[in-house]
């Protein structure tokens, strides 16, 4: 044997002890106050969410299958986006994304969901402003074109010209169909192709849970009339229960995208009062 002459009499690391020092001790004091103050620790918790903070900073790992998405953590609002001031209520919007996670849209299949999302990157708040669930009659001969027309109507009413489309599986040819439908309308749009490689459950959990657990996920009240809240209640990382999660997947995809910068309409335009008190 190769290691016969170098055999160890005792197993490697026999009798070792694990040293665990969480960033905050049992009394709530920082373990290293000169590096991590109370304010800095609170900021970290707000950024990564309670689950990741517990695992990485408190050394208390939470099994992913125990994770859930509680709709009680959502913060609802009624205000519409004010493009002139680039605001939703008191919040200044810095970016937006329109994201489409497509499917056939037929009954007994995955839902096709399109999400409009705004962001306030100063406060790290995310606003799910609208979720469009697309359905197609079983008799429809061209289900993808039918959905493209509905999405284009959605974009036109909100004065949007850019959309990100997930191209995994059925969506691989959808950007071309979307451009063709827009061309026939005379609409000028930009389509961004998105290919996801991570599992759906990881995408949903890692994108939504940190925002939800820290009170940074805002949802327009109209979305209470969609299947989204039922999706949250029935969702499990293991997929147990067979509940649809297509709206959640679309929101996760939108959160992961680089937002399009948003600026107030007419920003930089100043008014001047002319001095007309002169004689010729």
Task: Give the positions of each predicted feature.
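A short catalytic or substrate-binding loop motif that flags glycine-/basic-rich loops and adjacent residues
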Residues: 90-92, 105-110, 244
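Acidic, metal-ligating active-site segments
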Residues: 108-120
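Mg2+-dependent endonuclease catalytic cores in nucleic-acid-processing enzymes, primarily RNase H-like
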Residues: 2-31, 39-43, 60, 64, ...
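Short, glycine/acidic-enriched loop or turn micro-motifs at the edges of active sites
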Residues: 102-104, 169
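Well-ordered alpha-helical segments embedded in enzymatic catalytic cores
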Residues: 113, 146-150, 249
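ATPase catalytic-site recognition across NTP-hydrolyzing enzymes
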Residues: 27-102
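Conserved RecA-like P-loop NTPase helicase motor core
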Residues: 222, 245-249
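Acidic two-metal-ion nuclease catalytic site recognized across multiple nuclease folds
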Residues: 254-280
């Amino acid at each position: 044997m190769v290691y016969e002459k170098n055999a160890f009499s005792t197993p490697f690391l026999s009798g070792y002890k694990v040293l665990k020092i969480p960033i905050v001790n049992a009394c709530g004091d920082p373990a290293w106050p000169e590096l991590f103050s109370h304010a800095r620790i609170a900021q970290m918790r707000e950024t990564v969410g309670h689950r990741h903070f517990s695992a990485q900073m408190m050394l208390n790992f939470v099994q992913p299958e125990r994770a859930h998405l509680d709709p009680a953590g959502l913060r609802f609002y009624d205000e519409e986006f004010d493009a002139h001031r680039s605001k939703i209520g008191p919040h200044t919007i810095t970016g937006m994304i329109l994201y489409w996670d497509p499917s056939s849209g037929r009954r007994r299949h995955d839902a096709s969901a399109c999400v409009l999302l705004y962001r306030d990157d100063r406060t790290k708040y995310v606003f799910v402003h609208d979720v469009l669930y697309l359905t197609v009659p079983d008799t429809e001969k061209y289900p993808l074109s039918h959905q493209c027309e509905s999405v284009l109507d959605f974009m036109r009413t909100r004065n949007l010209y850019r959309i990100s489309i997930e191209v995994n599986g059925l969506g691989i040819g959808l950007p071309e169909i979307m451009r063709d439908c827009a061309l026939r309308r005379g609409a000028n749009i930009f389509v961004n192709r998105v290919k996801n490689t991570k599992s759906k459950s990881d995408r949903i959990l890692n994108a939504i849970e940190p925002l939800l657990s820290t009170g940074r996920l805002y949802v327009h009240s109209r979305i209470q009339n969609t299947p989204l809240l039922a999706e949250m209640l029935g969702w499990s990382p293991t997929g147990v229960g067979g509940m649809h999660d297509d709206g959640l997947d679309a929101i996760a995809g939108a959160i992961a995208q680089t937002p399009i910068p948003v600026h107030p309409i007419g920003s930089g335009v100043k008014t001047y009062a002319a001095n007309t008190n002169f004689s010729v």
